[in-house]
């Protein structure tokens, strides 16, 4: 005997979700304005089962039990007892098949001519993304036995009633040409994210567990500036973005190992927040038909939660998540190339300098010091000859001097590549 969750007439150890999407898009043009507009529909049925209550409604956070006295796999209302606490005679669980859910997302954008050398653009879009299936189906093969699930399934349950994650985005910009060679643009954008996946604490009898749900949220906003210069043999562009990204949780599973707090959530800097982003590139033609290009890039470091001392031992500063920032990323690349034709074939020779200034950027850091190559004296005090106290700190060394030599925490040094390319007709 088995539960046919896929409704395909046989037992299987997988799920077969169904997705459907369609969109309509159109463009309206007049001499002074262009409008793009459209609408999209997304539908999904996870083809799974969900706990339900005595009213036949979904109850993904709490199982309901009933006494199946006549063993017909159906709760006979008014005859058989039902409760949200386990322990009934001939106990069975109330389940309900998942349904189709749909989301409609409109998008619109327009570009309006202000003068013969300036335009104004605006865009709005509503976007949906289905949750990761892992968070939908996690441990749902044990829904019929909640007690076993709570005891052996690490207390986490998927949820086939979750909605798609939603993002609303607005953006506007002015684009202006100055003279024959210069142009600039100023733009601003806002992105609101909600209905993101998280795990919420639930209780059933003596058991405490976590159920996937749409509870997390975040936001991002930014300002874009672009300055461009073009000439017959020279061109360059400078792009700068200032932005702030915040979320109430770093990722869906962050609450799995967290401590339950009965208090309103709040936004903190997202782990991918980079407030300053600066890019510059130029290209030109040198004597002899040589093309040259240079790119330079600067980006703020990522935020991280600092390590503080609570007594003698270090611990994560949970009260101030992502309150410190790692080193910034900096890079400069230079390239030269020359094209010529010989024997009815096109040839090109080139020389690329990656990381021209030989800057060793930090990919990862130690949260105690904020440095990629120094974990802090609390840890380096254990480096030395075994059984000795090399720094007089009252601790005995048990690690070699190479233990914290981890070059992969830094980016690659300068790299010079020479190449030859042949194009065959």
Placement of each model-derived feature along the sequence:
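Outer-membrane beta-barrel channels and translocator barrels
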Residues: 30-33, 113-117, 167, 179, ...
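Residue-level signature of outer-membrane beta-barrel architecture
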Residues: 26-30, 41, 102, 110-113, ...
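Gram-negative outer-membrane beta-barrel transporters
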Residues: 44, 181-306, 421
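C-terminal beta-signal and adjacent terminal beta-strands/loops
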Residues: 289-313, 329, 338-425
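Residues that define the transmembrane beta-barrel architecture of outer-membrane proteins
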Residues: 16-20, 100-104, 166-170, 219-221, ...
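Transmembrane beta-strands of outer-membrane beta-barrel proteins
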Residues: 35-39, 120-122, 184-186, 236-238, ...
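Membrane-embedded beta-barrel scaffold of Gram-negative outer-membrane proteins
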Residues: 113, 119-121, 125, 131, ...
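Signature of Gram-negative outer-membrane beta-barrel scaffolds
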Residues: 1-115, 131
């Amino acid at each position: 005997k088995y539960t046919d969750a896929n409704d395909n007439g046989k037992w299987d150890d997988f799920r077969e979700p169904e997705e459907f999407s369609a969109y309509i898009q159109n463009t309206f043009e007049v001499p002074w304005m262009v409008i793009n507009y459209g609408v999209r529909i997304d539908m999904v049925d996870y083809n799974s089962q969900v706990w339900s209550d005595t009213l036949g409604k979904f109850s993904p956070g709490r199982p309901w039990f009933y006494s199946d006295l006549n063993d017909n796999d159906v709760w006979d209302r008014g005859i058989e007892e039902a409760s949200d606490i386990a322990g009934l005679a001939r106990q069975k669980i109330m389940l309900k098949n998942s349904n189709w859910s749909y989301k409609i997302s409109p998008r619109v954008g327009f570009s309006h001519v202000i003068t013969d050398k300036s335009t104004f653009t605006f865009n709005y879009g509503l976007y949906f993304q289905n949750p990761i299936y892992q968070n939908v189906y996690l441990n749902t093969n044990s829904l019929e036995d909640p007690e076993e699930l709570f005891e052996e399934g690490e207390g986490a349950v998927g949820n086939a009633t979750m909605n798609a994650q939603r993002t609303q985005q607005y953006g506007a910009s002015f684009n202006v040409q100055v003279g024959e060679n210069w142009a600039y643009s100023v733009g601003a954008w806002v992105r609101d994210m909600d209905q993101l996946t998280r795990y919420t604490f639930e209780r059933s009898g003596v058991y405490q567990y976590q159920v996937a749900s749409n509870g997390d949220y975040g936001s991002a906003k930014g300002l874009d500036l672009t300055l461009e210069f073009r000439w017959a043999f020279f061109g360059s562009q400078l792009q700068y973005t200032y932005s702030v990204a915040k979320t109430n949780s770093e990722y869906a599973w962050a609450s799995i190992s967290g401590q339950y707090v009965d208090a309103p959530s709040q936004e903190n800097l997202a782990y991918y927040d980079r407030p300053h982003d600066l890019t510059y590139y130029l290209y030109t033609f040198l004597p002899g038909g040589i093309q040259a290009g240079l790119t330079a890039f600067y980006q703020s470091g990522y935020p991280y939660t600092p390590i503080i001392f609570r007594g003698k031992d270090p611990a994560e500063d949970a009260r101030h998540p992502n309150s410190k920032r790692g080193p910034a990323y900096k890079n400069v690349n230079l390239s030269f190339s020359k094209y010529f034709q010989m024997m009815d074939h096109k040839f090109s020779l080139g020389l690329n300098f990656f990381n021209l200034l030989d800057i060793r950027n930090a990919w990862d850091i130690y949260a105690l010091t904020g440095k990629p190559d120094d974990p802090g004296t609390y840890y380096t005090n254990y480096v030395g000859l075994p059984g000795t106290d090399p720094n007089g700190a009252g601790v005995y060394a048990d690690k070699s001097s190479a233990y914290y030599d981890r070059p992969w925490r830094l980016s690659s040094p300068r790299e010079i590549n020479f190449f030859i390319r042949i194009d065959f007709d």
